[in-house]
Swiss-Prot record:
Pfam families in alphabetical order: GTP_cyclohydroI (PF01227)
Enzyme class: hydrolase
Protein name per the record: GTP cyclohydrolase 1
Subunit structure comment from the entry: Toroid-shaped homodecamer, composed of two pentamers of five dimers.
The family this protein is said to belong to: Belongs to the GTP cyclohydrolase I family.
Alphabetically ordered keywords of this record: GTP-binding, Hydrolase, Metal-binding, Nucleotide-binding, One-carbon metabolism, Zinc
Binding positions for Zn(2+) per the UniProt entry: 108, 111, 179
């Protein structure tokens, strides 16, 4: 299936800036990927001395394969990039548009455990306006791949800048990393904040302060 124009533009912009997730060319169909993941997951679970003949575990390798391909890592495939509605700014709206408390769930690429948090996104319209739900869908798309929070924040910024044809975009993410909470240091209270600011949000202290102060 051919990629959408929006997907092609965003992918090219990320490659140009060195912000694309490290990925190899995709040579398998979704079903082929599921079959191969299922096979190797059986090997992993068997090495952990789990009895896959048990009713509770028998279908686990296939369930994991489907979850990886269709859900939590579906953002690795640009065929899944959301359908984007961008319209001309005929009304000349030039004030900040802000969407906050966007839920995000991603996966740490170092240990493949959960990153759970929220995003706040703002932009100042120039020529284009985007459907508000599309902002949430873009966050979700880039969250559904192995990630580091810093790159995820930048990817969402560049995607919106590319689609809206403006640099005036700001992204802030607050998240709990389960590689910190459930293993290693076992810190159950800390969270991580990242920001990516473009255009006037980066160059104008008042605009930057307005965005960051309202994001608390």
């Amino acid at each position: 299936m051919a990629l959408s124009e929006a997907a092609v533009k965003v992918q090219a912009a990320l490659h140009e800036r060195g912000l694309e997730t490290p990925m190899l060319p995709n040579v398998f169909t979704p079903e082929e990927r599921k079959d191969k993941i299922e096979f190797h997951m059986k090997e992993i679970l068997t090495l952990m001395s789990l009895d896959l003949s048990d009713d509770s575990l028998a279908d686990t390798p296939r369930r994991i394969a489907k979850m990886y391909v269709d859900e939590i890592f579906s953002g690795l495939d640009y065929e899944n990039f959301p359908k984007i509605t961008v319209i001309d700014n005929k009304m000349g709206f030039d004030e900040m548009v802000r969407v906050q408390d966007i839920s995000l769930t991603s996966t740490c690429e170092h240990h493949l455990v959960t990153i759970d948090g929220t995003a706040t996104i703002a932009y100042i319209p120039r020529k284009k306006i985007i459907g508000l739900s599309k902002i949430n869908r873009i966050v979700r798309f880039f969250s559904q791949r192995p990630q580091v929070q810093e790159r995820l924040t930048q990817q969402v910024l560049v995607a919106l800048q590319t689609l809206l044809e403006t640099k005036d975009v700001a992204v802030k993410m607050d998240a709990v990393h389960y590689c910190v909470k459930s293993r290693g240091v076992m810190d159950s209270t800390s969270s991580t904040t990242t920001t990516a600011l473009g255009g006037i949000f980066k160059s104008n202290p008042a605009t930057r302060a307005e965005f960051l102060n309202q994001s608390k």
